[in-house]
Swiss-Prot record:
Purpose: Binds calcium and phospholipids. Regulates microneme secretion.
Protein name (database record): C2 domain-containing protein
BP term (GO), one: symbiont entry into host
Cellular location(s): Membrane
Highest taxon of source: Eukaryota
Recorded coiled-coil stretches: 1349-1506
Polar residues bias: start-end ranges: 27-36
Source organism phylogeny: Eukaryota, Sar, Alveolata, Apicomplexa, Aconoidasida
Biased composition (Basic residues): 1834-1846
Length: 1846
């Protein structure tokens, strides 16, 4: 090979030849290129030069090292065998190299050829063997290519090398990283060795991922510097040959027409050309009148009235009464507008009636016509050679219009990704019941571009060829455009895809297919709004639902593209290739795009097909001959076609008068105009109009509909009467908008149903996807269509709402775009979705705000919710159900007369406005929208005829008295745009790189910001903490993208994560967490946002520590969802702890005051109406009707407290309307009285039985509490009667009829049994009412089962005897108790006053304590301050001495430098003088020699004069040469002097730098000394604090002892009381036994003695146990005391504060809540974390913080310990399944992202280990936040202190 001539070269130090070569090269660059070289280098010199260039950068080894390198094993990647095979399996790659150009940068011409080494790992190495250097090569080459020689490549000339090669490369994915493409450019020499001019190397992976078009510059080393030699331009197609498996799933067809139907319909045009039938539609899809416009009678009114009541509608509550008090005037205005609307609608009956105006026929008009038997065939077209004829044929289905094939099958396709993108699917639908000639009923072609990333397919079927011919022959071709032959929907899923993708398009033509070819030349000047100086640009051409791009031109504003684009033309048949069909495909759009940090739209133009073939004078253009060369076969094809060459001005989005022209040419392959038959009839197309693509009937009446629309707005008075343009109004009533191409479009044409590429079923995920598109502020009133916003990657709120609505329609969902105004009167748009709640049976409206991410929910906003339910079911129903429903309607409907329909519509309009419901819904969330003006979807526009506020209207858009439709018929409109395929997600390597840069830049910017404020930043980069934070970000992303069913689970996961974070917080620290979400990855924008919003970044606390987590998700369309989580941890100071204590104490006081006030109010209310027992008995208190009053319980209340509060507020506002509702409410109460009484009786009986079952009797029973409860019951019974009047005033949100539907209704048998039980237990109830507190009786009630039957009988007898005697006494006692109520209340008041006094005394005592402590602290601080001041003075003096000494040294150094400068300058002057003298002497010598010669020559003869003159001329020449040499010497001397000057200046600069560095060091020393002083201060303060803490701890321990002793005493008292009770029980039992069975006294005494002995033994055992417990507690206390001295100061502080904070009530709760530290699934659903997604909390701010309690571990007197709890937690962790454990299992090895389209793989910007959840839980997450005191630093600090003291 090439290196054979270098075998014997040993040294590489021969640099003389290289220098000479460099000098010659420099001379050659300066000379002209045409002149020949004076001296050509020898062969040896050329060899050495090429060797130097080739071996530059080659690795150098010793011989042993080289042998080790050869023995290294082959690299492998992957943990499993499958992954190893994935990376190491050799694959096939298709390579095409063509369009190679070379450009010379040198001044000399040269003959060039190029070598390409594609692949292979051959590498030359320099090896030292002893004293010699040798070259060895390792590895092999795979593909070597060489171009032909190109002669005379001139300077700055771009010359084509006419080289093209196609081959296959074989290598694995690892080989792409290791192997390279090596390019060598050689200069061809005819008689000597060829000369190497430059080498270029690049790994193959960069070409497999990069652009197809490549430009590279090659450099040459001349005089140890790199110089540009030449530039290569080439196109390299490098893609993997892959076996794709196309699986066709869920393919469905809708609205198919049978062949017999098509023939009958075409025959109908011939038979009835003039009499075309119109029919009335009653289908819910396009019917405004829901009940066939029938007459309404009185019973219909009653039904409407009942519906109104069922939906909480108040008839007398009108349109405007809810908003102001002047309801009468507003009513009159409202009535006027309603009358005017009625008149207007009657006048325009032809526009309002619901008649189908399309001339289609349905199955109901035809007889003996069957439904189709469809069969589908799918074939691939435009495929590479060898793939023609690949097809799938489905199974035939019989008599169905909506067929579905869940799995059509698979097609196996071998090729590259580009081959797949270029190919098309030809779909043919056949009716197998028809003959062969007319079997085809629909065809279409679908492009497969982007099918790998976006698998959804949807298209409309076109007419078959036999039908088109028939229509042309019979003359009804225009009517064929209105036909709807059906639609296709389906999925083409490709499970496995190549790993790498190449960017860019190829110009390729298949000779069998027609193409539109566009040649883009250049653009004069690119103009932008911001006047960007450099921009990367490309041109995109789109036509016939396909688009192609040119190559990218970098960093130029006048790009020269010179690239051709080929767009395949879709024709169903070869006979259809003509101008007529080409012109139907629309305009050709050429757009120019730019790439910088953001994507920029520069401008665009549009061209009609007519302009290609005809000039401005409507004359056909001439044909020209063109050539095409096939890439793979290299075969030339010549053809004749019409070429249009032109230049057009770009149309900008902004208003700009500057010129920017694009030069291009367009033609077709083959010539399409030659195939057209009717060339004479071709007419120039009409300019663009909004009604261009409308149905014919809608286009005819469009102007009338616009006039009616304006008249409706004027009658509502939302627009002034003089207004002619809607754009000038303050409200948002636009029905047309201008798009990016400056074309006006009807609003419904700007929306269409699009299947979402990201989580197609989740509305939250789609909303999140749309919000990840950046927002752009637009000055011009222009809207972007959804495809344009996706391509531009930006838009305003209206553009986002259009895209969001179209994605919602693809789910499918009832979605609308809303136009309205904000509270600042700005026009705004948002999205609304209508849903039906099955559980609660009402309709819901959701407003999706794209700018803020909020979702507002309005409940109960539909009157006819059944209609809403039907519409929702119809959207979600399957195709088969829709087939059955549609077929039934079409077959069994009857024709109606048009005049009859007009009369019915008249009646219906009048009756609608008569029975118009004037009530409005009230309540709801606070909305940012002031008005809602209109809503629209992809079919129609609806104008709001109700109130302007979105809260106070009904959303039944099908009722035209609420919402006026723009058109009475919902037409199927074609959208004004075509959705291009969504681009693929960003590559993992790029995302990881972006995440790393973002992470580092954010940290860097925060550090710079804090450093600018003289603040240091400390980062905690603990890996376990970062993993934990990243898990939190993943959970937040799950919540934002979860389905409706999974929202609760996502919230539970976040709550679980928060608990784990709380548990790991270190003591005496405060933690704050701030999660953020951004739709960009610009580090500057994100860091500025963080700095501006986070005020804690400005804190000067030295203990502040930060931690950062970054998580990026790649979304379809090359969008990024960026999550950032910042945690700040700060140490809590004593002041903050005191403040927290004060705040807690204040809150407790306020709560106590409120409770006391409530008790006072309740006691005052009880004194109002106090009934005596006689009054109760006279009114039959114990009857079934009044039991609810006597035994009223809180659980039996009908209304909750919230509803009562709403009632009271509502009464005060709406007292005027109460009189009109009294009669209705009274009737309702009478009707439901019997039902209510039965319910109350059943509840009261259950309550009575609860006395028997529940534990009523406790150890102590207070009379006061029992009497108070009794008084409350009495008060409720008396207060209820007074509430009867108040009920008439109250207006509920729910109807009075359905109040009791949710409760269970008891049976009659249960009620009778309950009443019997009540009569048996009357005595017990009576005693309870009296408030008797005898313990024995309550024990009998509690435990009746312990007694025998005889004992019960005796008790009953005794009770009957005593009951008669006690009745009289009971009455008297009851009266006394009633009289004594006042006394008890007085005592209560006195007790409350005493309590308040005690509280005040406590507060004063605490304040005095605080004052004393503060005084002591102040004294200590003053002493410390004095000492510190003295130290500072001493240190300042030292610093001043040092500074003065340093200044003196600096002055001396300056003087020395000045002296040195003076000496050097003096020496230079002396040298200059010497040089001048030498020059003068040389000149004088020359003059003298010339004078002597002249004197000698004068004596010569005249004959010798001529010779002498010649000699003189020669001497003059020599003198001139000497002068030139001297001048050169002078120049060289000047250069040397200048170099010396430069060196001296550099020395001076270095000296200055050294001085500055010394100054900086001194300043640093000063700062360090200051820091040391501050640290000493802090230490002294810490010592003082520690002493205070010790004192406080001692106090707290003494208080603990006192509390423990008090508790022991209380326990002993309780035990004694229990013993007394037991003894009493025993005595009573003994008495009863004596009555029943007489026993001897001796036996009784013996029994008693035995009993007493047993009781004594038990008591002794219990006392021993108590003593042991006391001793154990004392031992624990001693041990704790010793351990507490060794613990950290922070823990002591927190524990002491914790004991002070916890009250007795909280101490009880510690026992109940001891499992707070557990990390399990027992979560409180009422405390779910909902701030992250911001879906439901709309009033709260966007900033979200996670606050962690400083004191997490509680100390209690209970027996449990934290150690036992941790053991239990471990056991539960092993046994039970936990949500958190399920979450934190990371599945990195599963390649889910390759096959699942909805899988999101997070990117963190940092490689993290796969840590298990157990390790995270067991590790200390926050160890980096605490500064651990190191033993090494302390002695250093002590030394510094000693030095300072000395």
């Amino acid at each position: 090979m090439i290196l054979d001539k270098f075998k014997n070269i040993v040294n590489l130090s021969n640099s003389n030849t290289e220098k000479e070569e460099g000098k010659n090269a420099e001379i050659n660059e300066n000379n002209d290129p045409n002149t020949q070289l004076a001296h050509e280098p020898s062969i040896v010199e050329a060899d050495e030069k090429t060797f130097f260039d080739e071996m530059l950068g080659a690795p150098q080894y010793t011989y042993d090292e080289f042998l080790q390198v050869l023995k290294n094993p082959i690299e492998e990647r992957g943990d499993t065998e499958d992954m190893k095979k994935h990376w190491g399996y050799p694959r096939r790659w298709k390579v095409i190299l063509w369009d190679l150009h070379i450009q010379n940068y040198m001044n000399n011409d040269f003959n060039a050829f190029v070598d390409f080494d594609f692949g292979g790992n051959r590498e030359e190495c320099r090896i030292q063997r002893g004293s010699t250097m040798k070259i060895y090569a390792k590895g092999k080459t795979k593909n070597c290519l060489r171009t032909p020689v190109v002669t005379n490549v001139a300077t700055e000339q771009k010359k084509n090398m006419n080289f093209r090669n196609v081959f296959e490369y074989r290598g694995s994915y690892l080989d792409l990283e290791n192997e390279k493409l090596r390019i060598r450019v050689w200069e061809y020499k005819q008689f000597t060795l060829n000369k190497l001019e430059g080498i270029y190397e690049e790994p193959l992976l960069s070409f497999a991922v990069g652009e197809i078009y490549n430009e590279t510059t090659l450099y040459k080393f001349i005089k140890d510097s790199r110089v540009k030699r030449c530039r290569l331009y080439f196109q390299l197609y490098f893609q993997e040959l892959y076996d794709f498996e196309l699986s066709f799933l869920n393919w469905s067809f809708s609205d198919l027409l049978s062949s017999s139907y098509i023939q009958a319909k075409s025959y109908n045009y011939l038979s009835n050309k003039n009499n075309v039938k119109k029919r009335y539609i009653d289908d819910t899809s396009c019917n405004i009148f829901p009940h066939m416009c029938k007459n309404f009678k009185r019973f219909h009114k009653k039904k409407i009235y009942r519906k109104v009541r069922n939906y909480d509608i108040d008839k007398n509550f009108s349109f405007n009464t809810a908003l102001s008090d002047d309801s009468d005037e507003r009513k009159n205005k409202n009535d006027r507008t309603i009358k005017n609307l009625e008149k207007l609608f009657v006048r325009n009956l032809t526009l309002m009636q619901n008649i189908e105006e399309n001339e289609d026929m349905s199955y109901k008009n035809l007889q003996n016509i069957n439904l189709p038997n469809p069969r589908v065939t799918i074939t691939l077209s435009h495929t590479p050679k060898g793939h023609e004829g690949l097809n799938i044929i489905s199974i035939e289905q019989k008599s169905i219009r909506f067929p579905i094939w869940e799995n059509l099958g698979e097609i196996y396709f071998r090729g590259t990704l580009r081959d797949l993108d270029v190919s098309y699917l030809n779909i043919k639908v056949e009716d197998m019941s028809a003959p062969k000639s007319a079997r085809e009923i629909g065809t279409c072609q679908i492009s497969l571009k982007g099918i790998v990333d976006y698998p959804y397919v949807m298209h409309e079927l076109e007419a078959p060829s036999w039908l088109v011919k028939e229509a042309k022959y019979e003359g009804w071709e225009n009517k064929l455009n209105e036909w709807k032959l059906g639609t296709v929907e389906g999925k083409v899923i490709i499970n496995r895809v190549p790993r790498y993708r190449q960017r860019g398009d190829i110009y390729h033509i298949d000779s069998k297919q027609p193409y539109l070819i566009v040649h883009i030349f250049n653009i004069d000047k690119i103009i932008t709004v911001d006047n960007i100086k450099e921009l990367d640009t490309y041109v995109e051409v789109s036509f016939d639902e396909t688009s192609r791009r040119t190559r990218l031109m970098k960093k130029t504003l006048s790009p020269n593209y010179d690239s051709q684009i080929s767009i395949p033309l879709r024709f169903n048949n070869k006979n259809d290739i003509n101008y007529e069909n080409l012109s139907k495909k629309g305009l050709i759009y050429i757009d120019v795009w730019g790439k910088s940090e953001d994507i920029v739209y520069i401008g665009g133009i549009s061209i009609s097909p007519y302009e290609i073939f005809f000039n401005e004078k409507n004359v056909r253009r001439n044909k020209t001959k063109l050539e095409h060369i096939d890439l793979e076969t290299n075969v030339k094809i010549t053809y004749d076609t019409v070429v249009y060459r032109g230049c057009k001005k770009l149309c900008f989005l902004h208003d700009d008068q500057r010129m920017s022209n694009i030069h291009f040419s367009i033609w077709t392959y083959p010539d399409i105009l030659g195939n057209s038959t009717n060339q004479k009839k071709i007419v120039a197309p009409v300019s663009f109009n909004t009604t261009m693509n409308f149905p014919i009937k809608l286009a005819e009446k469009y102007n009338k509909l616009k006039k009616l629309f304006m008249e409706v707005l004027k009658t509502i008075k939302s627009i002034p009467e003089n207004c002619t343009d809607v754009n000038t109004s303050t409200r948002f009533y636009n029905y047309e908008l201008i798009n990016q191409r400056k074309e006006k479009h009807f609003l419904p044409t700007l929306i269409t149903s699009i299947k979402s590429p990201y989580c197609a079923e989740s509305m939250n995920a789609i909303f999140h996807y749309v919000r990840c598109i950046p927002f752009i502020h637009k000055k011009e009133n222009i809207i972007f269509t959804p495809d344009f916003t996706l391509q531009l990657k930006g838009g305003n709120a209206l553009d986002h709402s259009l895209l969001l609505c179209s994605l919602f329609l693809g789910i499918p969902v009832l979605a609308f775009v809303c136009f309205g105004t904000l509270w600042d009167k700005q026009k705004h748009s948002w999205v609304a979705t209508f849903e039906y709640n099955d559980e609660k049976n009402y309709g819901i409206v959701k407003f999706w705000e794209t700018t803020t991410g909020n979702v507002y929910i309005l409940k109960k906003r539909f009157i006819d919710h059944n209609r809403l339910k039907g519409l929702e079911l119809k959207l979600k129903e399957s195709k088969y159900k829709s087939h059955l429903r549609n077929g039934f309607l079409q077959r069994y409907e009857n024709n109606t007369d048009i005049n009859y329909i007009k009369e019915q519509t008249k009646r219906h309009i009048k009756q609608l406005f008569k029975n118009r419901i004037n009530d409005i819904p009230i309540g709801g969330p606070s909305l940012p929208y002031k008005t809602i003006d209109l809503i629209f979807n992809h079919k129609n526009i609806y104008v709001n005829l109700q109130h302007s506020s979105p809260l106070n209207i009904w959303y039944d858009y099908w009722k035209f008295d609420f919402w006026f439709p723009f058109s009475s018929i919902e037409y199927n409109l074609q959208p004004s745009f075509t959705i291009k395929s969504f681009t693929h997600k960003m590559e993992d390597m790029e995302l990881d790189k972006i995440a790393k840069e973002l992470r580092t830049n954010i940290e860097k910017n925060i550090n710079i910001y804090r450093a600018s404020r003289n603040l240091s930043t400390r980062w905690n980069r603990d890996e376990t903490l970062e993993i934990f934070l990243q898990v939190g970000l993943e959970l937040l992303h799950q919540l934002n993208t979860s389905r409706k069913e999974d929202v609760l689970l996502a919230k539970l996961k976040i709550e679980d994560w928060k608990k784990a974070l709380y548990h790991k917080v270190p003591q005496s620290h405060r933690l704050l967490g701030f999660p953020y979400h951004f739709n960009t990855y610009k580090s500057k924008f994100i860091s500025d946002k963080l700095i501006s919003t986070l005020a804690i970044l400005e804190s000067r606390d030295r203990s502040l520590c930060l931690s950062l987590a970054v998580c990026l998700y790649s979304l379809p369309g090359n969008f990024i969802s960026c999550y950032i989580y910042i945690i700040t941890c700060v140490k809590i100071t004593q002041r903050e702890l005191r403040k927290m204590e004060i705040i807690k104490e204040k809150a407790q006081r306020m709560a106590e005051i409120k409770n006391s006030q409530k008790k006072k109010k309740s006691s005052d209310d009880q004194n109002i109406d106090i009934k005596t027992m006689d009054d109760v008995e006279e009114k039959e208190t114990f009857s079934s009707t009044n039991l609810d009053d006597t035994l009223h319980d809180e659980h039996t209340d009908i209304d909750t407290e919230k509803k009562k509060h709403e009632k009271d507020n509502y009464k005060n506002k709406k007292i005027k309307n109460t009189k009109l509702k009294d009669a209705n409410i009274d009737n309702e109460e009478k009707d439901d009285h019997h039902h209510i009484t039965d319910k109350k009786v059943s509840k009261s009986s259950d309550l009575i039985h609860s006395f028997d079952k529940n534990d009523i009797s406790k150890n102590t029973f207070d009379k006061e509490e029992f009497i108070n409860n009794l008084d409350k019951d009495k008060k409720y019974s008396s207060f209820k009667k007074g509430n009867v009047v108040n009920k008439k005033v109250s207006i509920k949100n729910e109807p009075s009829i359905n109040i009791y539907e949710d409760h269970k209704i008891y049976d009659d048998e249960n009620i009778s049994n309950n009443i019997d039980n009540m009569e048996n237990n009357q005595d017990e109830i009576y005693n309870l009412r009296q408030g008797k507190t005898i313990i024995n009786e309550f024990q009998q009630v509690k435990k009746p089962q312990k007694y025998t039957i005889n004992e019960k009988r005796d008790d009953i007898k005794t009770k009957k005897k005593r009951s008669k005697e006690k009745k009289k006494q009971d009455k008297l006692e009851f009266e006394k108790l009633i009289q004594s109520n006042a006394y008890f209340e007085q005592e209560k008041k006195k007790l409350q006053e005493d309590i308040k006094k005690l509280e005040k005394d406590k507060e004063q005592f605490q304040k005095e304590k605080i004052r004393r402590e503060e005084k002591e602290k102040q004294l200590l601080l003053e002493e410390k301050i004095k000492l510190q001041k003295e130290k500072e003075l001493f240190e300042n003096e030292k610093l001043e001495r040092k500074m003065s000494y340093m200044l003196k040294i600096n002055e001396l150094e300056k003087k020395k430098n000045e002296r040195n400068k003076m000496e050097k300058s003096y020496k230079r002057m002396i040298q200059k003088d010497k040089e001048k003298k030498k020059k003068k002497e040389s000149r004088d010598k020359i003059r003298r020699g010339e004078e002597e010669k002249m004197s000698a020559d004068e004596n010569m003869k005249e004959e010798q004069k001529m010779r002498e003159e010649q000699k003189v001329g020669e001497e003059q020449k020599v003198g001139e040469e000497q002068k030139v040499g001297e001048e050169q010497k002078l120049r060289e001397e000047q250069k040397m002097r200048e170099e010396q000057k430069m060196r001296e200046e550099q020395k001076m600069r270095e000296e200055q730098k050294m001085r500055e560095e010394q100054k900086v060091r001194e300043e640093q020393k000063m700062r360090e000394e200051q820091k040391m002083r501050e640290e000493q201060k802090m230490r002294e303060e810490q010592k003082v604090r520690e002493e205070q803490k010790l004192r406080e701890e001692q106090k707290m321990r003494e208080e603990q002892k006192m509390r423990e002793e008090q508790k022991m005493r209380e326990e002993e008292k309780i035990r004694e009381e229990e013993q007394m009770k037991r003894e009493k029980k025993m005595r009573r039992e003994e008495k009863k036994k004596r009555v029943q069975e007489p026993i001897k006294i001796d036996e009784i005494q013996v029994y008693d003695i035995i009993k007493n002995e047993k009781m004594k033994k038990k008591e002794e055992k219990e006392e021993k146990k108590r003593k042991k417990k006391k001793e154990d507690i004392e031992d624990k206390y001693k041990i704790g005391k010793e351990a507490s001295l060794d613990e950290n100061n922070n823990e002591r502080q927190i524990k002491s504060k914790n004991i002070q904070e916890i009250s007795d009530y909280e101490y009880k709760n510690i026992k109940e809540n001891k499992n707070l530290n557990k990390f399990d699934e027992k979560l409180d659903l009422n405390q779910i974390y909902s701030k992250a997604s911001n879906f439901y909390d709309n009033q709260e701010k966007k900033r979200r913080t996670i606050k962690v309690h400083a004191n997490r571990k509680e100390n209690s007197d209970s027996t449990f310990s934290h150690i036992d709890d941790s053991i239990k937690n471990k056991k539960e962790y092993l046994e039970d399944s936990n949500i958190a454990r399920y979450l934190y299992e990371k599945r990195k090895h599963d390649l889910i992202g390759k096959g699942n389209y909805n899988f999101d793989e997070p990117h963190y910007g940092k490689k993290m280990n796969n840590v298990a959840y157990q390790d995270i839980k067991g590790s200390n997450l926050f160890k980096g936040f605490i500064e651990e005191p190191s033993s090494k630093k302390s002695p250093q600090k002590k030394k510094i202190v000693i030095v300072r003291k000395n």
